[in-house]
Every structure is written in C-alpha cells, then in structure tokens.
Amino acid sequence: MEFDLGEYFRAAFEDKLLVKMPDREDDFLTPATRLLEKRREMVEVEQALSTQKEEFQMKSESLQQRRAELELKEEKLKDSLFKFDKFLKENDSKRKRALHKAAEERQLAAHKEREALRLQAENTQLMQRKGTLLERQEKNSKYQQYLQRVLERTDEFQEVQEMIDRFNTLMATQNKLLKRDLENQELAEREKARLLHYQEETRSQILELNNQIAQLQGELERVRAVAFQWESRWAQIQNTAAENTLRLGRIRMSTLNLFQTISKQMRLKTEISVEDTEAQLEKIQICFEDLSAIYKDLKKAGTTPQTPAVPTTN
C-alpha cells in the first residue's frame, strides 16, 4: 500500500501552520516580545515536526516490515499451494496407476479364470479321450493276440512291430502305386482328350483349307478370264497403235511433200528439219493464209489469178 507523505504532513500540521491573525491585545507587544513568541512557536513546530517524522519513520518501518511479512507469507502460501497441487497431481497419478493396476489385475484374474475353465474342459475331453482309447485298446487286444500267434508261426519277423512296419511299408507302396496308376490314367485321359481335340481341330482346318482352295480356284478362273480379256484388248491396242503409226507416217510424208513443193514453188529458204512436222505444218498454214489474202486482194481488183496446182498425196 503506497503512503502519501504530502497528505500526511498536510493533515498533521494544518492547524499549527495556519497563520493566525494577531489579537488586538497583541498590538501592545514589543517587537522583542513578538520575536521571542515567534521563536517559541518555531521551536514547537520543529519539535512537532521531529515527533511526527519519528512517528512517520516508525510507521514506515512498520509498514515495510508488514509488507515483507506479507510477501513472505505470500511466498509461503504459493509454495504451499504448489506443493499441495503437486501432492494432488501425484495423488491423482497414484490413484490412476492404482486403478489401472486394479483393472489389469481384474483382467488377469478373469483371464486366469477363463484359462482354468478351458484347462478344466480340456482335461475333461482328455479323460473322455483316454476312456475311449482304453475301450478301443481292450477291443483291439484280440488283434494283438492274433498278430502274436502269427509271429509264433513265422521265422521272418522277430517282433510284432516289425511285422506291422512291414505291413505299413507294403501299404504305403501300394498307395503310391495306386496313386501313380491313377495319375497315369488321368494323364492318358487328358492325352486322349487332347488327341480328340487335335483331330477335331485338324478336320476343321482341312475343311477350311478345302473351302479356301475352292475359293482360290474360282478366283484363279476369274483372274484368268480377266487376263484373257486384257490380252485381247492389248492385242487390239497394239493393232490400233500400228495402224495409227502407219497413218502418222503417211501424214508426215504428205506434210513433207507439201512443204517441199510449196517451198520450191514459192522459193522459200528455210532451215526446218525434215523430222519437224509441226514446224512444217505451221509454215504451210502461213503460206496458205498469205495466198488466201493475195487471192482476196486480186479478186477485189477484178483479176483472178491462175491457181497453181498443188500436189496431192494419198
């Protein structure tokens, strides 16, 4: 708690420090008397201040001591609370561990009880099994006696167990042979089924191949007919080509003769090759166009020229 020193002194000395108006009877006091009076008042005030200061110091020390005691008590209280909280937590942890251990012990006890019941039931079953085996042993004792009599009559075996082992060996061999025979029969059946399946597939393939052969033969006949048609057409084309070649030769020969006749009569000088039929035809066409134009001009002028004879070709 914070202590206000100013408020404390103000409250303590408010009455003593107030300036009092002098009474009228003081008007007759001498200055020396007044000075002594003021000094006396100052001494009283200083004594009062000293007393109040000592009281304040004592109260302040008491308050500090009280504060220290309160802080110490607070620390002790905090420590006690911490220890109490720790105690509660440890106690709760111990309680949880105890509960967990009790639960585990209950589970273990239940498990042991179930195990005991199971062992008891198993023991009961074993006792029943033992009784059954004893009954079977008593029932099969006649076979033991029979085997003992057989052993006495043979010199091959010395004990009954040897005879039983020999019998078990023969039975195992028989079982192996029977198993092998069964496997061979199954293998033979599978091979027979595979053979039948293969024969069926082969017959189907042969039938399919025969159908394909028939189709291919028909296709071959059609191809041969088409080939014969194309051969006939090719012969016709060759004959037509020969005729066209012969006709083309005649045309080229006639063109050359006509070109040479025109060139000779019109005295044309050209460097056209005898093989260039197209150039010859172009030259002949130009000459015919020129002659036609000249003829038209002469006809307009009233003079009809004598048309030169143009050689004809077959």
Swiss-Prot record:
Keyword Cytoplasm belongs to the record: no
Recorded coiled-coil stretches: 34-133, 175-231
GO annotations of cellular component type: cytoskeleton
Origin superkingdom: Eukaryota
Alphabetical keyword list: Coiled coil
UniProt similarity note: Belongs to the CFAP73 family.
Name of the protein in question: Coiled-coil domain-containing protein 42 like-2
